[in-house]
Amino acid sequence: MCGIVGVVGSKNATDILMQGLEKLEYRGYDSAGIFVNGQETAAKLVKSVGRIADLRGKLGIDVSGTAGIGHTRWATHGKPTEDNAHPHTSTSGRFILVHNGVIENFVELKNEFLMNDTFKGQTDTEIAVHLIAKFAEEEGLSTLEAFKKALSLIQGSYAFALMDSEDAEVIYVAKNKSPLLIGLGEGYNMVCSDAMAMIRETSEFMEIHDKELVVLTKDNVTVMDYEGNVLSRESYTAELDLSDIGKGTYPFYMLKEIDEQPAVMRKLIATYANEDGTMKVDQDIIKGIQEADRIYIIAAGTSYHAGFGAKMMLESLTNTPVELGLASEWGYDMPLLSQKPFFIFLSQSGETADSRQVLVKVNELGLPSLTVTNVPGSTLSREATYTMLIGAGPEIAVASTKAYTGQIATLAFLAKAVGEAEGEVKAKEFDLVKELSLVAQSIEATLSEKDEIAAIVADLLPTTRNAFYIGRKQDYYVAMEASLKLKEISYIQCEGFAAGELKHGTISLIEKGTPVLALISNNEEVAAHTRGNVMETVARGASAITIVEEGVAREDDTIVVNQVHPYLSAISMVIPTQLIAYYASMQRGLDVDKPRNLAKAVTVE
């Protein structure tokens, strides 16, 4: 949600800012803007509602400079308008600010300090830049001291990048509970919400921790706390490749990322299994879980759905009870914990604000934790006790695909490793390397049937406004994820239900032509019951689509998926549903990668 990019010391600041904003599009936004300045060029501020392409269209040839900041906004305070778009300026125009996060006490700050100020928009960010200007222009503080004073008063989550038009080649940066990263170059330095926006310019990065302030010039990066104490900070090299963030010949990133899933499975085998089939999982993680009397999995959105599959495997292979919690609810109401809990946080980005809120509480209690994420160096990765990386490569499409399947596969390695360490027979007999290799083959088989799936979508989901996924056991978990994918990118109102709950209310919503998509994996008894539920909906006019594992398939089933181990069926069974969502969106002429109102990384609570 929202993206920040800034550069100082570059001869082509405008180009770098625009390319950076384009790389941040995946985070979700509704407006964008840049401010560019330089010692020998006039300052220029340009903002636009809509796509980055709209902003680029407003840029003139005179928008150039050696320093600047840019922003993609996802509206939280105020509608998507040019007045509410960032960067925001002080009344005099001297100070320019971009911000990601939520200032919780902006009303109080406005009432106490800025009652006589006039504001152009309705954002909390505009309050912040006016506050900085007040302390600098009315109290005579330096820009740095004015910024520090404002930061001491602001409550909430934020990532700030500030410029003073009177000092053209300095950027002031601060963060709290919102991601921000420094990029290091030769004769220039950068700041950005994540590394992908800077990877064309640098592979050398520096982390910023919460409640730290950074002063950037073209030759220096000074990190300090809010009291002004200078801090030492090591840089690191990011392992990102430009080819990872391109679409290649694909029309949308989502289809590319769906196709990458067999490779993700095989890469995870190489990462977490030795050649003899033994597990390569950190022994400290294994020991931490062995010492626990209960595992708590905390996640949101798609990662929450992946958590269901992880719960099933961990309980079965380790004989340890597992609870799954929604991060957004646990942040407000953490339940009574067991005597020796172990926490697992699932997050594609590693920046999910709700999950971090829970992790902060977990750390305050001194409890062990593991983050399973796709982004090394992310906030959740840094702040948890341990990290396991999915290694799926950048996921650009807002709708998560390969991160979901990668999370389940990664946690399969963890579950097997812990189970083996505990002497569990099931874990020893579970040949994960072989079974995950079969999953990769199953995915490839499904991907070879794209045209058939596209035709099914064109036949049954062309104009529908409502649809339902149903399933039992692990198929129910997949149904929830499948319904989320369909609704978020096709805008079809879709819900995923436990098939056995249909008669408890949901069946009243079935009418003639309502698509009901049933997931049926390889268990004869469960399959029979789910088929019975399908017939109940058909009797009431539903149009049924069955997605079935081959071991329980019939001639009239719609899509048949290769049979895999029950622990891993959530991976293979979800692939057809990802393609269904993709084609439903594409056939409606929608932007598959950037659905309306959604953000890739949810960095505000």
From Swiss-Prot:
Homodimer. The keyword Transferase applies. PANTHER family: GLUCOSAMINE--FRUCTOSE-6-PHOSPHATE AMINOTRANSFERASE, ISOMERIZING, GLUTAMINE--FRUCTOSE-6-PHOSPHATE TRANSAMINASE (ISOMERIZING). PROSITE patterns: GATASE_TYPE_2, SIS. One of its GO terms (biological process) is fructose 6-phosphate metabolic process. It comes from Lactococcus lactis subsp. lactis (strain IL1403). The active site is at 2 (nucleophile), 600 (for fru-6p isomerization activity). Pfam families: GATase_6, SIS. This is Glutamine--fructose-6-phosphate aminotransferase [isomerizing]. Disulfide bonds: none annotated. The lineage of its organism: Bacteria, Bacillati, Bacillota, Bacilli, Lactobacillales. One of its GO terms (molecular function) is carbohydrate derivative binding. One of its GO terms (cellular component) is cytosol. The keyword Zinc does not apply. Transmembrane segments: none annotated. It is an enzyme of class 2 (transferase). CDD domains: GFAT, SIS_GlmS_GlmD_1, SIS_GlmS_GlmD_2.
